[in-house]
Design a protein with these regions (language model features):
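Phosphate/ribose-recognition catalytic cores of enzymes acting on nucleotide-derived substrates
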Residues: 193-305
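A short acidic, often aromatic-flanked loop/helix-cap motif at beta-alpha or helix-coil junctions
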Residues: 9-13, 94-97, 153-157
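Residue-level signal for inorganic ion chemistry
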Residues: 30, 79, 116, 176, ...
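N-terminal catalytic cores of NTP/NDP-binding nucleotidyl/phosphoryl-transfer enzymes
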Residues: 11-66, 71
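N-terminal Rossmann-like or analogous alpha/beta NTP/dinucleotide-binding catalytic cores
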Residues: 60-142
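Short acidic-hydrophobic, aromatic-tinged amphipathic segments that line or gate anion-handling sites
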Residues: 2-11, 88-89
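Glycine-rich, Lys/Arg-enriched anion-binding loops that position phosphate/diphosphate groups
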Residues: 139-239
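Short beta-strands and strand-loop turn motifs
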Residues: 22-24, 54-55, 87-91, 115-120, ...
């Protein structure tokens, strides 16, 4: 997949074939986003065109779209896995002032678009003035087909990244995973911690959520961790470590991987979240903390048995 980081003509290998372009922010690549992208890929396959995605970049911390569910690298990998060949992702500042007409003409011109695909809640142009109905009106005289994909549903309500964030905040991992269409996962660098887990005989990997990422509820989760091509059952504690830390504002993510030993510092293993296990709490003794970690690990092994 070729990534183009500005609103500019795509370097199409066969310009005469044109493209089918999926449009949206696609922040979580949830089941609704995937339906839009897969529709563009399918149209391109049926009409001998190149499948493309048009989206835009926001600063890591922003108030416009909420906290991030995916890193940029993971987002690119997921979209590429769906069969997309071209990925156009200018900065939002570059396109925010375009009228709906300018926006559509720019995409049709730069992508040599034969079809534009969007969700039924898609907006475009300055102040989000455009909608799918206007998109059809603008594309008709250009001979460009418009495909509007119905919003995906979960529990009889539309799937959205906002709903996924809310599910994560509540610790409802099954709901978040159902809407994502895959396990919620993190892939952050393993950093040195205080070494308490090693002292207790339950060494953990420590990962910090970068600023701007959505945090799940602080508690203990059943997870699995991908290391060296192998998935290991694991237990992950997310929170302020109340037993040993008086600073309730410092959130850490610690994962115990029973049966694994090795140096993971500086690597970025994938940790998938599968189920809520128990609330985060302060223990009276370190022995109680050790017992809790071992019990969580046992539950994780049973879960994946």
């Amino acid at each position: 997949m070729q990534i183009i980081s500005q609103f500019a003509p795509l370097p199409l290998a066969q310009p005469e074939k044109g493209t089918a372009v999926a449009m949206g922010f696609f922040d979580g690549i949830h089941i609704g986003h995937r339906a839009v992208i897969e529709s563009a890929v399918q149209w391109a396959k049926e009409h001998d065109a190149a499948p493309a995605v048009f989206t835009f970049k926001l600063p890591m911390v922003n108030k416009m779209k909420g906290k991030r569910l995916l890193s940029t690298a993971d987002k690119h990998a997921l979209i590429a896995s769906l069969g997309v060949e071209y990925y156009l992702t200018p900065d939002f500042e570059e396109i925010k002032g375009l009228t709906p007409e300018q926006f559509v003409l720019g995409i049709v011109r730069d992508c040599n678009a034969r079809a534009l695909v969007c969700g039924e809640n898609f907006t475009f142009g300055a102040k989000a003035a455009g909608n799918p109905e206007l998109l059809r009106t603008l594309c008709a005289p250009l001979g460009v087909e418009v495909i509007v994909v119905p919003m995906a549903q979960f529990e009889e309500k539309p799937v959205s990244s906002t709903r996924i964030r809310t599910a994560l905040e509540g610790g409802d991992i099954p709901a978040a995973n159902a809407m994502l269409g895959m396990p919620y996962a993190i892939r952050f660098e393993v950093q040195h911690g205080a070494g308490l887990g090693h002292t207790l005989g339950v060494p953990t990997i420590n990962q910090l959520y970068p600023e701007g990422f959505q945090l799940p509820r602080s508690c203990i989760y059943i997870t699995r961790t991908h290391i060296g091509g192998v998935w290991y059952p694991s237990a992950t504690g997310l929170g302020s470590r109340p037993t040993v830390n008086d600073d309730a504002t410092k959130v850490t993510c610690e994962t115990f991987i029973p049966g694994f030993s090795g140096d993971l510092y500086g690597t970025d293993p994938v940790v998938e979240f599968h189920a809520y296990l128990s609330p985060s709490k302060k223990f009276d003794t370190l022995d109680e903390l050790r017992a809790c970690i071992n019990n969580a690990a046992k539950r994780a092994q049973e879960y994946f048995a």
